[in-house]
Amino acid sequence: MATLHIEHPISDLPASLGAFSRFREARRRAVVRAERVLHPVDDDKYIYVSLDFDSVEQAEAFQNFLEANVWTSREASPALAGTPRARVLTDVDSASAP
């Protein structure tokens, strides 16, 4: 499994969540297995997104899609308030709490 971890400043949380929702079908086509959207408890102008994929290649392909089609468009990402930082991560160790 691979996770595409994204973080960036936003101008408005509801607008950011709305933009995220509009790309639900793109995430489905990219075979996103799980997704999480978070923001710091003390900063509603910053957002973190984690998207899980079956492979590193799928995660990298979706990152390329975001970089080429979403983050470059004000219409597609109206709440984006800075440069997104995205990295593909893989598990090296994990466990569930008892």
Annotate each language-model stretch with its function.
Residues M1-L4:
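Short structural boundary motif marking the start of a folded domain
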Residues P9-A19:
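Short, surface-exposed ligand-recognition loops at beta-strand->loop->(often short) alpha-helix junctions
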Residues R85-P98:
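Short, low-order "capping/linker" segments at domain edges
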